[in-house]
């Protein structure tokens, strides 16, 4: 049996990015043969990535990038908030955001196939899954290409906003982006609110108004009033400006001789059902997984 030295473990870790203990185990299994140990690790990390792929990713980060004429937001998901703070995970998210802005992929599949450091983006992702031990997924991205100005705002790493705007004052773009993160409008103007949201609000308003017992014509006016109130509340231009609620966003923009063309808002895990296991079930699952290895 060949002696496994610390320098051998360090060399294998540098080649594979695998955890120290995994490197030592692989070298021991390979009887000190570096090439064989590297192959064993790559197979093992690949298996690790495959096992992780079925697990829910409801945590993560939003990353942004703005270049000369394009900007992007990317949501990268993982399983725990601990990994969401990992330096390698965050560096990958920022790199992916830059790729979206500069390479203009059509969708996540096209993004995953882009070259990155001699591999594809997906191969780098899988290597990171193997290294960290959690499932990692690129959930979505948005890209704005324009000759206008772009502003981004990240609230921590869980909320991200990108805004396309015109105007001389850069602070206006930053303020609008921050406002979007705080107030979470669903559209630029009331005309842009999705029809399904309006219909849902109308049904709720009709049910409430019907309970009032008032005449039909009064009920109809109550419903219309509720819907109009809803449209103002969820459209950016009609919302009171978060830094000065005596002005709407539209009024603030007009006073600044500025205009917003569009915006996008990402909130990490929005719409993803996060699995809640009890402690006993979690322990049982870990024991079962250990028996299969």
From Swiss-Prot:
Residues 80-83 are annotated as: Involved in Mg(2+) ion dislocation from EF-Tu. One of its GO terms (molecular function) is translation elongation factor activity. PROSITE patterns: EF_TS_2. Pfam families: EF_TS. One of its GO terms (cellular component) is cytoplasm. Keywords: Cytoplasm, Elongation factor, Protein biosynthesis. It is found in: Cytoplasm. Gene3D superfamilies: 1.10.286.20, DNA helicase RuvA subunit, C-terminal domain (1.10.8.10), Elongation factor Ts, dimerisation domain (3.30.479.20). The keyword Oxidoreductase does not apply. It comes from the Bacteria. The keyword Transcription does not apply. Belongs to the EF-Ts family. Associates with the EF-Tu.GDP complex and induces the exchange of GDP to GTP. It remains bound to the aminoacyl-tRNA.EF-Tu.GTP complex up to the GTP hydrolysis stage on the ribosome. This is Elongation factor Ts. It comes from Burkholderia thailandensis (strain ATCC 700388 / DSM 13276 / CCUG 48851 / CIP 106301 / E264).
